[in-house]
Design a protein with these regions (language model features):
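Conserved beta-strand core positions
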Residues: 10, 39, 73-75
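Short amphipathic
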Residues: 7-15
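C-terminal structural segments of small proteins and small subunits
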Residues: 53-88
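Amphipathic, hydrophobic secondary-structure cores in small proteins
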Residues: 14-67
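Short, compositionally biased "basic patch" segments
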Residues: 1-7
């Protein structure tokens, strides 16, 4: 489920979802954002620490922060100007 915080960051809680769902939903959410927008993703899947940074790179976005608290990882992502391989 996603929400928008007071600073305009889209909050996406993917807790409890297993691979590949956190990566797929992160990609979908990033593609729906306007360039320069921020996305905060919370995930508990151990593979999210590998998969989500790869999605961020593939989408031409920037991983601004990664916080871990036990099994919970929180990713702060800024969408780039455009996806590197976007088709017109």
């Amino acid at each position: 489920m996603s929400e928008i915080s007071q600073d305009g960051t889209v909050e996406l809680d993917l807790s409890g979802l297993k691979c590949p769902l956190p990566a797929l939903r992160t990609r979908k959410a990033l593609r729906a954002l306007a360039p320069g927008s921020r996305l905060a993703v919370t995930a508990t899947d151990p593979l999210a620490g590998i998969d989500i940074p790869n999605v961020v790179r593939e989408e031409g976005a920037a991983l601004e922060a990664l916080e871990r608290h036990g099994p919970v990882a929180r990713f702060l992502i800024r969408r780039g100007a455009d996806r590197p391989n976007a088709q017109a």
